[in-house]
Amino acid sequence: MLILDATMINTLTTGIIETIYMVFVSMIVTYVFGLPLGVILFVTDKGSLYPNRIVNLILGFLVNVFRSIPFLILLVLLLPFTRFVVGTTLGSTATIVPLVVSAIPFVARMVESSLKEVDAGVIEAALSMGSNWWQLITKVLLPEAKPSLAVGAVITSVTVLGYSAMAGFVGGGGRGTIAINYGYYRYDNNVMIITVAVIVIIVQLIQVLGMKLATKIDKR
């Protein structure tokens, strides 16, 4: 039987709010940078719209480097940068920095992959009608790739949620910190069970709602 006092319930509630805050803000900032980066990777690729081997190689190399670093290692490596950006390395706001840095390369590759799924005939038709690069990207490529981009956003959200829990090892706030401080160090199985249950519920909500949205906007 799970027994929790009022203080622990309040702590768990705060942890849920912090986790949602970290994931939500991280996703927004990640897509602000990751979406354009993915578009650039796509359009500068060999045989694409505006091929540029040097730009594509440099950006692709940087993306691959950051994608290859495990999150916990990246979290530690970015501690000085995190302190510089937000003034501290503890708490949910500080955790957003490494979450964004780790997720941007992931999103960039997701976006690049989604754009590659767009029918070449649609792109050729837009070019034949005199569309410029901005119109081609905003009116053709991104709208046509919306279903795939939505699925990618769901996958990214779940990934970021998992990473946010890992940040608990360094006092990153949210569910991870609660699980470490109360469930691991104090051997409180009740807290561990509830923490896992809440994370599972959040993941299921993201998955179900995200996939419904992707299906709704898929007009193919």
Locations of regions flagged by a protein language model:
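Transmembrane alpha-helix signature in integral membrane proteins
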Residues: 12-43
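Loop-to-helix entry region at the N-terminal start of transmembrane alpha-helices
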Residues: 14, 18-22, 67, 71-106, ...
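Membrane-embedded alpha-helices of multi-pass transport/permease systems
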Residues: 32-37, 93-97, 101-123, 154, ...
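C-terminal transmembrane helix and the adjacent membrane-cytosol boundary/short C-terminal tail
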Residues: 40-46, 192-220
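Cytoplasmic-entry segments and transmembrane alpha-helices of multi-pass inner-membrane transporters
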Residues: 40-77, 99, 104, 110-113
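Short helix-to-coil transition segments within interhelical loops
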Residues: 115-145, 185
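Transmembrane alpha-helices
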Residues: 133-166
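Glycine-rich helix-loop "coupling/hinge" segments at transmembrane-helix boundaries
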Residues: 163-193, 197-198, 218
